Amino acid sequence: MEREEEKRVSTLQQSFHHSKEPTFLINQAVLFGESHSSFLPEIERDNRGEKIKTNPRKNRPGTVILSKQSSRRIMSGSQPRPPVIPSRRPGFRVCYICGREFGSQSLGIHEPQCLEKWRVENSKLPKHLRRPEPSKPPPFSGSGSYSLQAANEAAFQSSQAQLLPCETCGRTFLPDRLLVHQRSCKQKVEGPRAPSLDRSDDLAGLKKVSSGITTRPRTVICYICGREFGTLSLPIHEPKCLEKWKVENDRLPREFRQPLPQKPQPLLTGQPKHAGPRQGQLVSCPNCSQTFAPDRLPVHQRSCKAQPSGPKVQDLTLGSRGGLKESTNPKPQRNMAAPPVTDKPKMIRRPPTIVCYICGREYGTKSIAIHEPQCLKKWHNENNLLPKELRRPEPKKPEVRTITAKGFYDLDALNEAAWTSAQSQLVPCNICGRTFLPDRLIVHQRSCKPKVAK
């Protein structure tokens, strides 16, 4: 009986050992089996009790080895939201010149290079856009994140102080970028009204703007060339511009020479009046009536040709009796300060085009002869790639018939015949009936499906 009991205990120990369960369960299982075994002698129980008493260090009743599942349950129960420690961001510092962030070690290398770059770019700007050199904010005596944040805020404000507002839209830019922006920034038509100097509320608004933001100095228009200059630059520019105007005016033909432009009187309302003399110097073209500067008119007349008209139109003026009489002035007035007033509206004649009989597109009279051989060669290549049932016969060029006694082609009839020839190559789709070029019909038929009758 004792041997059987020992075998049973040894098998229990092996099974618990292989299952990797807590070790204290083995003793409980053994004790549980001993408590229910009525046939074991009392001496054996006493001996086991002595073994437990004699070896108290080997058995650790206070420690428990937990499995992975039980440990997760206990941790989730005791700590439902474990604390998350964020990774500490390194202390970045803001450059007081450009406003970008750099590491504490990199900032000492960056600032001298950034200041040198700032000086180079500032020296390239016009004088009225140049800014004073930015000053580095004083270091803060405190320590910790508060002093770092205050230093970065002061550096950022120093970099933002260099921005200049656009006079048109009010947005702020760096001085070198403001010039680029002003090329494309145009004032809105329905913008706010311009403040007049007579109203007290407008004067108060101007004082607020001038006290808050440093605006770009106003520009004045040159009465000779019409360009804008600063108030200090204009007195230097005007004598040079007038000298240049005299040289160019002397080179012109006599009928195009203009009188010396007179400087307008200074007015409080200022700038719009300066453009008056510049507009008065413009000369109109006798062919198209457009106005140009005198030196630009000969350049324009090289390409501007009078519109061909059939019968010569006589210059008719109203007589005293209400009838029409022919003008007695044989010479056309070429030196006109304003365009002539005519009852007929200006008609811009489109250059004549010819339709290609192969592709149906329009080309100029010179380009069509270059295009047609290339288009026909391309047509042959594409036609050979088609299936045999979709190949078309070669398109024929329509006959060109000249009108008797005039010697030029009837372009309308020629284009109509070429368009008909190009349209005859289209093939209808057998499903929807739409017409396509043969190479496009194959692509269309992949997605064309018959409509399902309702």
UniProtKB/Swiss-Prot annotation:
Zn(2+) 6 binds at C429, C432, H444, C448. It comes from the Eukaryota. InterPro entries: ZC2HC1A/B-like, Znf_C2HC_C3H. Residues 66-79 have a biased composition (Polar residues). Pfam families: zf-C2HC_2. GO terms for molecular function: zinc ion binding. The keyword Metal-binding applies. Keywords: Metal-binding, Repeat, Zinc, Zinc-finger. Residues 48-85, 125-146, 256-282, 299-345 are annotated as: Disordered. Coiled coil: none annotated. Its cofactor is Zn(2+). The keyword Metal-binding applies. Zn(2+) 2 binds at C166, C169, H181, C185. PANTHER family: C2H2 ZINC FINGER CGI-62-RELATED (PTHR13555), ZINC FINGER PROTEIN 474 (PTHR13555:SF68). This is Zinc finger protein 474. The lineage of its organism: Eukaryota, Metazoa, Chordata, Craniata, Vertebrata.
